[in-house]
Amino acid sequence: MTASDPTSKPAASTPAQDLAARTRANQERFAAGIGSLDARELENLLMNATNLAGTYYPEDRDKSGFALYAMSEADRARPLAERVPPTPLRHYYGYRDGKYHDDLYLRGGFADIRTIRKVLADDGFDQMGERIMEFGCSGGRMMRHLEAEAAANEVWGVDLHSAAIHWAQAHLSPPFHFMTNTTAPHLPFEDNSFGLIFAGSVWTHIGELDDAWLLEMRRILRPGGRLYITISDENTLAEVARISPDHASNGHVAELDAATGMLSKDWVAFVTRTTPWLQRVIYRREAWLERIGRWMEVRHARPNAYGWQTGVLLAKRG
């Protein structure tokens, strides 16, 4: 028998073996009861795993599970549009000077809905009586201001974040309807189900599945229905750099440019960082509109319609 060479290096592991080893280590941590994964570790584990199924952000839980609760009497006494979710569910909306402000959160949602209503009115589209969906609703920051529409037809909110959906189900339903979706580009609705779908700052995070999700929106829209979404584009880059030069996203773009040289090339889109909440997707607006215009009619594109983002109104042909 030949002795092994003590100077030889072990064979390099494959990505699958590395993932399996990390998974076993995480399972052992849970089994030993020495602590759970923090949110960032859990996000990276879930979103970077190679699989064919969609994923979502689950409720925080320990070994015994988790519980859901009805809204408090204090919240029940408030008008529906003034019920504010816990700060972890607000995703920086209403955040200023190092803290969250309830009034800014509520006013911002109202202002964004007012913008959508104006865009639709300018396009000659009346959303009253239409079945409506907010894609990426979180705690209902915007759709809570559609009570009149909800009295006329169903208004749905869907999101990856199950805790936000559970909060909304307890505090905003009725009159609204909510469900948790996954990253897989499919929603459990029939073809031609909705007259209006809107999504604020969602296509800014989707990444490689953006076209698949756009086509899913087209599937569930009725012919003549409208899709209103917001995107980050070259105008967004310029506005962020001009107004907030110390914003972290400027550094993310510079880091990717240093690695790829993209800004000196004819780029059409790029993604900084990873995972749905962290990644940022930037489109060259005209190139993107030209491509998606083959699938849906482009009715309107307005820079700075949603903060620094460009609002885009699309219509399903037919």
What are the roles of these predicted feature ranges?
Residues 206-216:
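A short, conserved alpha-helix within the catalytic core of class I
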Residues 185-197:
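A short acidic, Gly/Pro-enriched loop at the edge of an enzyme's catalytic core
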Residues 128-138, 228-257:
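Conserved class I S-adenosyl-L-methionine
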Residues 108-128:
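Conserved alpha-helix/loop element of class I SAM-dependent methyltransferases that forms part
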Residues 141-186:
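Class I SAM-dependent methyltransferase SAM/SAH-binding core
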Residues 276-295:
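Short alpha-helix
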Residues 19-99:
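N-terminal, positively charged/glycine-rich alpha-helical extensions of SAM-dependent methyltransferases
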